[in-house]
Amino acid sequence: LVLCYGGSGGSRKINDAMKLVVRNMVKDDVAFIFATGKSYYDEFISSIEDLNLKPYQRVVPYLEDMANALAASDLVIGSAGAISLAEITALGKPSIIIPKAYTAENHQEYNAKSIEKQGAGVAILEKNLTDVSLNDAVTRLLGNREELLEMANKSKEIGKPEAIDLIYDEILKIYNANNKEKLHKKESKKSKKEENTDTNVDLDKKEDTSSQGKVIGIKKK
């Protein structure tokens, strides 16, 4: 199963490149799910209306059950957002990553190149993305089960399926540290208050003693 999506809103560049890929996957009887994005759906469907899709070949505007689709996939095509890549690698999926251009500090390109460098996927920059370049990458990987399996293993190695537990532990650690600091400050304040109270009591005693009148004797003439 090939899963393709261009982020929650879709990607025109990916959609344009996928037209040839979808045609060839239909011809080769490959199972796929392609989420076009709601705003691009009608346009994409019009471009492939001559094709007869099988029940296991789906083009949808938006994928409601991404978790199960991702778990069932053998190859993922998508952008290089941090959350997407975390999900892909947590499940050990080989991927073709297409980083969006003009993202903050070009982080998607760095993400994609990191995945490729570690052997977990193939990176195709948006400026180099064409229907032919994407189709060639898909055809190569689907035709080479050994390479696909190797990528899956590498993806699993760099994935962090326990990430949510690590994040929870870190939050708990910070929370406990803050509480400990607050408690320490509270106890310190209480201690100072008690010291001030003791000091005031001592001063009051001194004032009471010093305010006692002296008996002045009257001399008889």
Regions inferred by a protein language model and the residue ranges of each:
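C-terminal alpha-helical cap of glycosyltransferases
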Residues: 160-194, 213-221
